[in-house]
Amino acid sequence: MNFKKTENALSLTLKNFIKSESFGGIFLFLNAVLAMVVANSFVKESYFALWHTPFGFQIGDFFIGFSLHNWIDDVLMALFFLMIGLEIKRELLFGELSSFKKASFPVIAAIGGMIAPGLIYFFLNADTPSQHGFGIPMATDIAFALGVIMLLGKRVPTALKVFLITLAVADDLGAIMVIALFYTTNLKFAWLLGALGVVLVLALLNRLNTHSLIPYLLLGVLLWFCVHQSGIHATIAAVVLAFMIPVKIPKDSKNVELLELGKRYAETSSEVLLTKEQQEILHSIGEKANALQSPLEKLEHFLAPISGYFIMPLFAFANAGVSVDSNINLEVDKVLLGVILGLCLGKPLGIFLITFIGEKFKITSRPKGISWWHILGAGFLAGIGFTMSMFISNLAFTGEHKDAMEVAKIAILLGSLISGIIGALYLFLLDKKATLKK
């Protein structure tokens, strides 16, 4: 297998991913703002009622379906987590997490950036009904963070952008582990055994080099159902499925055919407009090049725009809407303070301190081209929690403790906004200072 070719192709995927995520972050922000406006307007009752509307189909007295809110949080977000899983697998095999030397610094940073916010929140809410929300400020929203850092353009070193992306990927992996370990209740082992059986079949398909995505996706639906029924959040099934999707390029004669088509195209006469023959050759090249993509690349290319421009903005619109009126109790335990301090203070301090200590003890080394001041700036941007923080708040606060969920959402919005503004201004002024010195 030509690993160099695969690595180059996956590098191109990363560039496309950055582009879609950065613009997707802006769209995500607009939907969050729209949700807050609608939730505090004259149509707020219709807004909140909409998400409880059941969608599905009925067979006799048996209804198969969910509320619209559950369709978004359990089904559509599973596709988002599938893309995250594909991204993590790609980085582990070919990217910045593919070796200890590459991975150690951002992974250690992600660990510090999760532990510190979690401890701050837990310390403030210990021995209260809200202490279970410690996972809320531990997450980083890669779309928002990338959106901010891309707006800064050339003022930010490329190495810092790569560091932030890799940190966010490692952070996503950590958030998935937190969800699986701490936000799982009433496990049903019969369904877990069923899920394990599906995973074994998926592993067998991978082992047999099955490159068609259809059997993986069909079994993925079955895996989602088993995991959903087991008591573990169904989005974990999507991550497991992602790790079963093959990364190997299909072995056939299409690469030889591509060379022949390229040679034919080069031999055709140069025209201002493409001839019919040239158009047919280019069409054939496109088809054969697409066929040479690995299943992982195909699925990631398909999911990236859907996730960035539909699923995440819809999730934001459905979950960011909080009615800020006299009835909301902002003093529910210390949820507001715990989340805001966790995101705005815990994230940058945790990331900076653990990496600084790690380098001093020669456990890891800082990437070339970025200073400790840059690391601190990236830490502030990592405090933009939003999507994953909102998702965890939905899992942490249910039933009688829904007041805490509303407060947590306000805190996530405020904390993410403060972190984004501080991070952007800090990196902007840091670049300006460096320019003046020159």
UniProtKB/Swiss-Prot annotation:
Pfam families: Na_H_antiport_1
GO MF, one annotated term: sodium:proton antiporter activity
GO CC, any one term: plasma membrane
Record field: catalytic activity: Na(+)(in) + 2 H(+)(out) = Na(+)(out) + 2 H(+)(in)
UniProt KW Transmembrane keyword: yes
GO biological-process terms attached to the record: regulation of pH
Top-rank taxon: Bacteria
Location, primary (coarse class): membrane
Membrane topology: Multi-pass membrane protein
Transmembrane segments: 23-43, 62-82, 104-124, 133-153, 162-182, 185-205, 212-232, 302-322, 337-357, 372-392, 410-430
Subcellular location: Cell inner membrane
UniProt keyword terms in alphabetical order: Antiport, Cell inner membrane, Cell membrane, Ion transport, Membrane, Sodium, Sodium transport, Transmembrane, Transmembrane helix, Transport
Role according to the record: Na(+)/H(+) antiporter that extrudes sodium in exchange for external protons.
Family the UniProt entry places it in: Belongs to the NhaA Na(+)/H(+) (TC 2.A.33) antiporter family.
PANTHER family linked to this entry: NA(+)_H(+) ANTIPORTER NHAA, SODIUM ION/PROTON ANTIPORTER NHAA-RELATED
Protein name: Na(+)/H(+) antiporter NhaA
Organism: Helicobacter acinonychis (strain Sheeba)
